[in-house]
Amino acid sequence: MDKLRSPYHDTMRIAGEVAERNAWAAKASDFSNDYSLWQQVGQTNQKGKFDDIVNLFHNRFETIQEIFRTQAGFKASGSIKQIFREKGRNKDYNIVGIVLDARRTKSGGKMVTLEDRTGTITVFVRKDDPACATIMTDEVIGVSGRFDKSGGEMFWVNRVVYPDILTSNQNKGGGDFDPVSIAFASDIHMGSKEFLEAEWDKMIEWMNSADETAQNIKWFVLSGDVVDGIGIYPGHENNLTITNSFEQYEMCARKLDELPDHITPVILPGNHDAVRPAEPQPMLEPAVQEKFNSAIHVGNPARITLSGIDVLSYHGKGIDDIVPRVENVSYEHPEEAMKLMLKKRHLAPMWGERNALSPEEEDQMVIRTPPDLFVTGHTHAHTVEWHRGIPLVVSSTFQGETDFMNMLGYKPKKGFL
């Protein structure tokens, strides 16, 4: 039994940092499968026209501006047009805008062009401002500062403000949740030659054991890429044992059927799954869902309440745009990107870069309210961190190193739960 438990027992959940182990000795089978899905994403009638993109950014701006006002305690002094009209040399102004452009200066600071519906303004952010290194185009930020003393139009920023999570705004499930556990994994990649089938089967065997931690698991959240897919990258077929995506899902369904009755899997798609690549991604199509007997299928991202815990689950493709543009964020430490997502209140701020986005009528990548827990996958890393009291879980992979990963320098932390 100890050999069976050892790979998973201590990494099973963050509850060890939240409550004593004895408080989590309840059996999950004694509690109902209560869940609620906040919003179903990716169901769109948009055509991807220019006006659709404009409307998306209008919605993004208005939504995050409201978050600034109601949750972050920061209110704009007016529109950019109003501020220009009323500007004074010795008066402080608060501005909220979308970052149209951000460029480094010779001094190390940034010249940032902000935009709202009424116009644009160029502001200067000093290099010693902690936010200087993290400003990204297309995100919504707030700045506080003054116009140049000479009476010009240059705006000097005293501080950059993000619509970050306030401690007083944390939900914490309202204290009304069942004493059961949620297990997390991601990037299983069934159908790949590097799928760690032996490790996966050992985990399922442990989940079926009498171990009290295993008996306490109610939900098993799989944050995307449950299969390896086909044609994802050049030469992909050479790394597959199953070259038909439907057969890959059939294998996944068979494996999940081996879960004990008290554990319900929750499946969202990732960039290897058989859905559109642009985020937000819809849930797997009905023909695929039919292969699974008891799984809950959601889109990507998903905001789902499980036994009273508000979980934000996101595959994590937006990390691909943050890593090359923000210092101290890497694929080895994706939790730093997750912290920025919460600070910025957006899962994928940049438009049209490595991560494709769909111009929905409503920007479904905005984090409108603080979750109780935030989980991602995609990077094949594994860690647990915290931001403003919110647990951040980077789900581990069940895929070993592929030639493509070696080319990219990926070093997966595999086989953790």
Regions found by a protein language model. Give the residues of each.
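Extended recognition/assembly regions associated with phosphoester-bond processing machinery
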Residues: 1-417
